[in-house]
């Protein structure tokens, strides 16, 4: 699977699909730049009257709920419906679901209205979705946009968390990509783990939003499962390499953020094969 997924980087850059991002104003610039770096063509169109046209023109649409402004809800709902109508891939990042009733209601609505291909979130967010759709009664105490300390993925809880991720993917007929120290990805049938986690990622804002957009770009040219895997691998390995360069130069998180996009720009199949730590959970 590692070699198979790695070939999608060149395929993405050759096709350069329009990647339509309905995202938040905190991270919009970094999201656009990381899509360009990995090989996509970003369009950050958010106005309701033009959403259907952008969905039809794009290879994929991404919905990010980070700054859930009132005037963003209608465009998100239009995108959810129209991607289903046009069979355009849809990636959802339900940022901070579980924190407020509004976010819970919008998440349920978007999932029910669409045929979402990938849902990308941290473990707290995925547990919240599992609870909203009656897949589990386990409560998760969300910490704003960040993962709760109780939900951090470790080698001790990986199997139970992976089992839940698979159950959510199966129930919602989608692919779930959970980012953390260890990434968990499942399409409801198979479960894959990525052990390239980089702690410095949590010291910059937007790393999760960027990852969602990268996965989205890959969704335009390959299956949701492969897109989630190669997107997560590319971002995780870039984080490792960016941290090394930061430490060599005795720099900090600001430089790490720049190096992260640099490493995404230079990412290729050879780097994936050299550094990728991808495992199938049996």
Curated annotation (Swiss-Prot):
<feature type="binding site">
    <location>
        <position position="179"/>
    </location>
    <ligand>
        <name>ATP</name>
    </ligand>
</feature>
<dbReference type="InterPro" id="IPR029056">
    <property type="entry name" value="Ribokinase-like"/>
</dbReference>
<keyword id="KW-0808">Transferase</keyword>
<comment type="pathway">
    <text>Cofactor biosynthesis; thiamine diphosphate biosynthesis; 4-methyl-5-(2-phosphoethyl)-thiazole from 5-(2-hydroxyethyl)-4-methylthiazole: step 1/1.</text>
</comment>
<keyword id="KW-0460">Magnesium</keyword>
<keyword id="KW-0418">Kinase</keyword>
<keyword id="KW-0067">ATP-binding</keyword>
<dbReference type="GO" id="GO:0009228">
    <property type="term" value="P:thiamine biosynthetic process"/>
</dbReference>
<dbReference type="Pfam" id="PF02110">
    <property type="entry name" value="HK"/>
</dbReference>
<dbReference type="GO" id="GO:0009229">
    <property type="term" value="P:thiamine diphosphate biosynthetic process"/>
</dbReference>
<feature type="binding site">
    <location>
        <position position="44"/>
    </location>
    <ligand>
        <name>substrate</name>
    </ligand>
</feature>
<comment type="similarity">
    <text>Belongs to the Thz kinase family.</text>
</comment>
<comment type="function">
    <text>Catalyzes the phosphorylation of the hydroxyl group of 4-methyl-5-beta-hydroxyethylthiazole (THZ).</text>
</comment>
<feature type="binding site">
    <location>
        <position position="206"/>
    </location>
    <ligand>
        <name>substrate</name>
    </ligand>
</feature>
<dbReference type="GO" id="GO:0004417">
    <property type="term" value="F:hydroxyethylthiazole kinase activity"/>
</dbReference>
<dbReference type="GO" id="GO:0000287">
    <property type="term" value="F:magnesium ion binding"/>
</dbReference>
<keyword id="KW-0547">Nucleotide-binding</keyword>
<keyword id="KW-0479">Metal-binding</keyword>
<feature type="binding site">
    <location>
        <position position="120"/>
    </location>
    <ligand>
        <name>ATP</name>
    </ligand>
</feature>
<keyword id="KW-0784">Thiamine biosynthesis</keyword>
<protein>
    <recommendedName>
        <fullName>Hydroxyethylthiazole kinase 2</fullName>
        <ecNumber>2.7.1.50</ecNumber>
    </recommendedName>
</protein>
<dbReference type="GO" id="GO:0005524">
    <property type="term" value="F:ATP binding"/>
</dbReference>
<dbReference type="InterPro" id="IPR000417">
    <property type="entry name" value="Hyethyz_kinase"/>
</dbReference>
